Amino acid sequence: MQTLYLDAFSGISGDMFLGALLDLGLDFEQLKTELAKLHVHGYELTQQREAQSSIYGTSFDVQVAGGKDHGFVEHHHHQHEAGHHHDHEARHLADIEALIDGSDLSDTVKHHAKAIFMEIAQAEAAVHHMPLAEVHFHEVGALDSIVDIVGCCIGLELMQIDTIMASPLSDGSGFINVAHGQMPVPVPAVMQMRVGSAIPIQQRLDVHTELITPTGMGLVKTLVREFGPLPENAVPTRVGYGFGKRDTGGFNALRAVLFEKKKLSQQIVNRTADAVLMIEANLDDQTGEGLGYVMNQLLTAGAYDVFFTPIQMKKDRPATKLTVLGNVNDKDLLTKLILQETTTIGVRYQTWQRTIMQRHFLTVATPYGDVQVKVATYQDIEKKMPEYADCAQLAQQFHIPFRTVYQAALVAVDQLDEEA
């Protein structure tokens, strides 16, 4: 069995996922043979090896006979798949589950495909405030999207991939145009699927369109159980790129990496040291509300940390020292924010070297629900810390002490270690 890492620096969609698997070596003819077990007809699959920004990858597409370009429609499930064609047939969740159950696909593929559709259906039901049974899959229920989702599950089985990890996902910002007006990014179904999941998502303010489709988010939420950078003990064996079809103004691809893990003692551990920028300013006439606002603005802009220290200035004035830690490349951005949002007329800079533990996330199942756990490593040192937000949410939901959920998460992590 193999481990797959998804580097979603430009988001994720169904066709990008399949394109990446094909670029990694998934047999196209085998994929078509397995998809025929759905017992549906009237579609054609295409793959094309091409280059974006001089980097070669694979584009995957589904075309439905007699269909037309759907462009941007109500639920907007396929921003990345803007070239797909279908007949706009609407299906309910029960119709899709019956189609999958009636196929000759393996039980594993059926289970995963139905779970993905369930995630999307639950999100749509919440967004549109309707019973789950009444949700219409105006797009994901269409044939091309069924092929996307089932095809991804088939591809993972054919390639014997049993473990999937992912980077933090990237999404765009602003608004997109749909049949009934404008929709914010992340789109509502994607945002709804984030509820209770702790899937890390960063918004790119330089991209004014959708990067994560509900199909892509459904795939990630159902199949990915660990988030973070590529493990430091990973030895990549193959890299593939699946291209999206949206013009994002940049390199629009999902990078997929097949890798093997080696023991940390077998390799030199790198990337434990880097430089961090520290910016300081003394403020003796800034309101408390203003301080809170600038902290939020700086953190939103990418600062690593922001904190305040009470100080005594000349003429015995009580004041506040603002300290901002951030990336050295963000010096101008953070400086402009400080000068714009505070009363200071100058700032101080220092660059510090630091040693950091490598971090990644995994999800563990507790009796109360899933909890994200941060795993930090440095040489032979390892620390595991359940995420506060997950534990707090479950403690409130079940009216139990926070510590009870926290300890349950630690027990679940220990069980994973024993199984490994």
UniProtKB/Swiss-Prot annotation:
It catalyses: Ni(II)-pyridinium-3,5-bisthiocarboxylate mononucleotide = pyridinium-3,5-bisthiocarboxylate mononucleotide + Ni(2+). Disruption phenotype: Deletion of this gene leads to a loss of lactate racemase activity. Its EC number is 4.99.1.12. InterPro entries: Ni_insertion. Disulfide bonds: none annotated. NCBIfam families: nickel pincer cofactor biosynthesis protein LarC. This is Pyridinium-3,5-bisthiocarboxylic acid mononucleotide nickel insertion protein. The gene is larC.
